[in-house]
């Protein structure tokens, strides 16, 4: 836990035990930055500052939705900044604030263990560095909070820019026909969409919070303008995220159209192939019918000749005077009859 006083001459670090005396000062802004909300921090929040137990509990637990609680002498906010994780997952980096008359308490909410703890401190570290270098001298707790939250809004905007570059690359791959594995490409599209939706939600909720704070009459002089400025920053991030989301939706729809056309072309090619195979099968059947018909025609004379060639002892037909011509005529008649039948059935 860092206990700091910020005044015209710079920034100074103090012990936690000095907090009750420091809060009595009117010539400085008291800034308490809590990287991890442990038991000691909870005791300070509840015991020294006397914050509401629900607000203290929110600091100790992970909150997935931004919120604001307005109390008579201070304001409590829960904000989020995005951090891109592996495989397109978006981590919610939480920043809680208690903004009072002459103090600001920043609490960095619990984060996923896979996220570098330094990521949660980037906004407060950046503002601390500006104060230490003499580039920034906040005159009130609201001015100090404005600087920190503005850094958070810029991080949201930077996240949108990163996702936007990914969207442009995805569009180029779609229009260039270089999508590779379709399933993997679809996953990339929806990871980008997930990122834009996540940061859009963060910005929209944060903008609504600061829009509400800008309308409070209890905010000190100049504080309302600072709150309104932050609300505008979040609204701008939301608008940019909305625009990129619509742009990405166009890329997704175009890719779906490409997939549909490709599927139709493949189906058409398959239909042509099936038609070709059907025609080949039909032609083959026609040839088989012709072969079968001619085989039947030639089989009839062969049958008669086979009967006469049996050479049994008792075959009266062998001794008929007209046996031979009768056999020839019968062979001819059978052949002609079969030919006529097959011809009528269009087998020949």
Where are these regions (language model features)?
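N-terminal pre-transmembrane cytosolic regions of membrane proteins
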Residues: 1-60, 110, 119-127
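Cytosol-facing regions at membranes
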Residues: 1-2, 10, 20, 24, ...
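Short secondary-structure boundary/capping segments
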Residues: 21-22, 67, 89, 96
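Short, structured protein-protein interaction patches enriched in aromatics and acidic/basic residues
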Residues: 60-77
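Short, surface-exposed charged micro-motifs
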Residues: 65-67, 94-96, 200-202
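Extended alpha-helical interaction modules
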Residues: 72-187, 204, 211
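Membrane-associated alpha-helical segments
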Residues: 102, 171-176, 180-308
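Alpha-helical transmembrane anchor segments
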Residues: 289, 295-348
